[in-house]
């Protein structure tokens, strides 16, 4: 099914992709341009709605649906009503209430109202966090040591500052820790700390650099464009500090762009070269539906990895060898046809990739072609305004029985977005629709998810306020769209695009409980037969004092794109309990694969959650 929203400015379409991210792939991945030739391509969107439409049954009368209709008029009606609607949708509530923080995450409201922060990067040498306001057009910094906002620098030529209903997305922001030779000398003398700041600019189809030594900006024009959308939509940027080069890609350009820092000149395209990505594997698909996801630079093998997709149809991973100047192409299976975020592991042996429009992330071994899928926990009921975790089966602890599931759609996905490698080899990714930050440790296959305190009802399928069916007054998501890892301070910093906040996740805080699976790491189960798995939850002696909420047992699996069990069943002997009076609790998880489940290898995620975190372990499952 396709839906067409016409007469919407291209940049405003990002709103649509976030309000209904199941029907519309995140950052502008799924826009086609055409409706009988009557609508200009840059004002037309073709939205691909597949079987994984998040809460489609609930959205018709939702408040978000009303906001969507109003938002479609934003760029053509600069009226008081349009401005008010824009501010309600994108500007957050501008409060500094402590309720928007917990023992793991602290959120900070930005110095100005309605900044719409997106790109963010930790400057480890300067002990700062840098971010860009996509609305105000400022580059801001936050002092990590002093825990306060430092300074905001005005970016020149940022037209959205003057237009009350406009913005320009800055998806990627990086710190060049090496900088120029002059800058290195200044660092040695203590005159300046940290390297120059690089970031993308969608609307001006450009790359910016902020030079710390002179506190000035330079802009470099991308020497190419999209005839359909008016911008390459630069979305992912990497820096090679040894060769003084930057690499970047644009959503609407099948190209790898390489910038030679020694030759790039302010206000021009000089020093930027274009490498065309071979797209023959996408033959038969409208080129406007073929988009570039992101890149990852592999310094050990001097290569650039690129994800490319036609959402729901075809996905490929490319490796560009910078020495040989050649591409190697890796075809992906149909169920992983939407690769987005890409990260290279510590040994440069595996890629870790997020799959757009699902709850899936996976490991790809380029040498063998072997793929191992993992899945997040299922979308929390809190996203939909439900405080109580209720699953089918009349409260008997059943996780999935193919029947009713309260007001939670089986098709609700968490949307793992970007993915980054930490210094210890673990992987971080943001669950944009799940409203969580997640850490996965490949060494022990442990997934830890941290709940984002802020929720915005305008960005979710929420029940009416005052509903007496057990629904909560809090609902929705915070739109965590980008993040950066601080290796020095064991912190992860992230932006909340529609909430006017940046957040800090303190990874040093102890988890309130641990989860141990008694069974071996790999199980074989026959279809139609049940298998018991012992799970032990132990309270941490060093758990934070605030972590005293009830424990909920949770499970998910790679049987479906959302982590749902489909027609298979799984239930806990006890699903909800308190750890206030006991040090540990053992429960049994019983799993029975359905007879119609295809034989093969799957991943079962079993764990527990409280109000703040989810703690899961992965078990390999062979279904025969």
Show the residue positions of the predicted features:
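Short loop/turn segments that connect beta-strands within beta-propeller blades
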Residues: 143-147, 211-215, 260-265, 321-325, ...
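Generic structural signal for coil-to-beta-strand starts
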Residues: 127-128, 180, 196, 244-245, ...
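Blade-level signature of beta-propeller repeat domains, shared across WD40, Kelch, NHL, RCC1
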Residues: 475-512
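Conserved beta-strand positions in repeat-built beta-propeller and related beta-rich domains
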Residues: 123, 130-135, 197-203, 247-252, ...
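Beta-rich, blade/repeat-based domains predominating
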Residues: 112-124, 158-181, 192, 225-241, ...
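A short helix->beta-strand "capping" segment at the edge of beta-propeller domains
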Residues: 90-114
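Long beta-sheet-rich domains in secretory-pathway and surface-associated proteins
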Residues: 511-624
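A short loop-to-beta-strand structural motif that recurs across blades of beta-propeller domains
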Residues: 138-140, 206-209, 255-257, 315-318, ...
């Amino acid at each position: 099914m396709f839906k067409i929203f016409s007469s919407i400015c291209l940049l405003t379409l990002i709103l649509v992709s976030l309000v209904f991210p199941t029907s519309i792939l995140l950052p502008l991945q799924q826009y086609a341009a055409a409706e009988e030739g009557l609508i200009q391509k840059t004002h037309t969107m073709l939205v691909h709605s597949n079987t994984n439409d998040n809460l489609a049954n609930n959205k018709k009368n939702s408040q978000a649906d009303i906001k969507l209709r109003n938002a479609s008029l934003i760029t053509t009606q600069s009226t008081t009503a349009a401005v008010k609607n824009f501010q309600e949708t994108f500007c957050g509530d501008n409060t500094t209430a402590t309720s928007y923080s917990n023992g793991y995450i602290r959120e900070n409201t930005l110095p100005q109202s309605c900044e719409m922060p997106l790109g963010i990067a930790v400057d480890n040498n300067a002990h700062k966090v840098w971010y860009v306001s996509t609305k105000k057009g400022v580059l801001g910094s936050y002092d990590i040591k002093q825990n306060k906002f430092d300074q905001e620098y005005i970016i020149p030529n940022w037209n959205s500052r003057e237009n009350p209903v406009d913005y320009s997305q800055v998806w990627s922001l990086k710190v060049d820790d090496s900088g120029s030779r002059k800058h290195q000398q200044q660092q040695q003398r203590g005159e300046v700390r940290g390297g120059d700041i690089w970031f993308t600019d969608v609307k001006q189809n450009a790359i910016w650099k902020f030079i710390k030594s002179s506190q000035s900006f330079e802009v470099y024009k991308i020497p190419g464009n999209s005839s359909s959308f008016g911008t390459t939509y630069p979305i992912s940027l990497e820096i090679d500090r040894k060769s003084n080069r930057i690499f970047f890609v644009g959503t609407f350009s099948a190209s790898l762009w390489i910038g030679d820092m020694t030759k790039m000149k302010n206000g021009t395209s000089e020093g930027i070269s274009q490498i065309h990505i071979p797209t023959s594997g996408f033959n038969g698909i409208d080129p406007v539906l073929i988009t570039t996801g992101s890149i990852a630079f592999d310094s050990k093998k001097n290569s650039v990895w690129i994800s490319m997709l036609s959402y729901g149809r075809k996905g490929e991973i490319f490796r560009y060898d910078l020495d040989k100047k050649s591409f190697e192409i890796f075809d992906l299976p149909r169920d992983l046809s939407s690769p987005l975020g890409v990260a290279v592991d510590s040994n440069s042996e595996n890629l870790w990739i997020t799959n757009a429009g699902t709850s899936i992330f996976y490991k790809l071994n380029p040498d063998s072609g072997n793929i191992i899928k993992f899945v997040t926990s299922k979308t929390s009921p809190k996203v939909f305004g439900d405080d109580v975790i209720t699953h089918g089966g009349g409260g008997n602890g059943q996780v999935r029985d193919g029947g009713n599931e309260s007001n939670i759609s089986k098709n609700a996905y968490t949307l793992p977005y970007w993915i980054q490698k930490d210094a210890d080899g673990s992987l971080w990714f943001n669950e944009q629709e799940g409203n969580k930050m997640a850490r996965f440790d490949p060494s022990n296959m442990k997934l830890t998810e941290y709940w984002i305190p802020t929720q915005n009802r305008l960005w979710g399928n929420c029940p009416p306020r005052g509903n007496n069916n057990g629904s909560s007054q809090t609902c929705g998501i915070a739109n965590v769209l980008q993040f950066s890892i601080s290796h020095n301070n064991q912190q992860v910093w992230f932006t909340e695009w529609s909430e006017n906040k940046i957040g800090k996740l303190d990874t040093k805080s102890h988890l309130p409980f641990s989860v141990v699976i008694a069974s071996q790491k790999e199980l074989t189960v026959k279809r139609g037969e049940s298998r018991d798995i012992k799970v032990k939850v132990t309270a941490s002696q060093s758990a934070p004092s605030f972590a005293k909420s009830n424990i909920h047992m949770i499970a998910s699996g790679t049987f479906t794109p959302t982590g749902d069990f489909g027609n298979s069943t799984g239930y806990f002997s006890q699903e909800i309990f308190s750890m206030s009076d006991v040090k540990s609790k053992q429960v049994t998880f019983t799993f029975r694969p359905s007879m119609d489940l295809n034989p093969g290898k799957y991943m079962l995620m079993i764990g527990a959650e409280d109000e703040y975190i989810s703690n899961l372990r992965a078990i390999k499952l062979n279904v025969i």
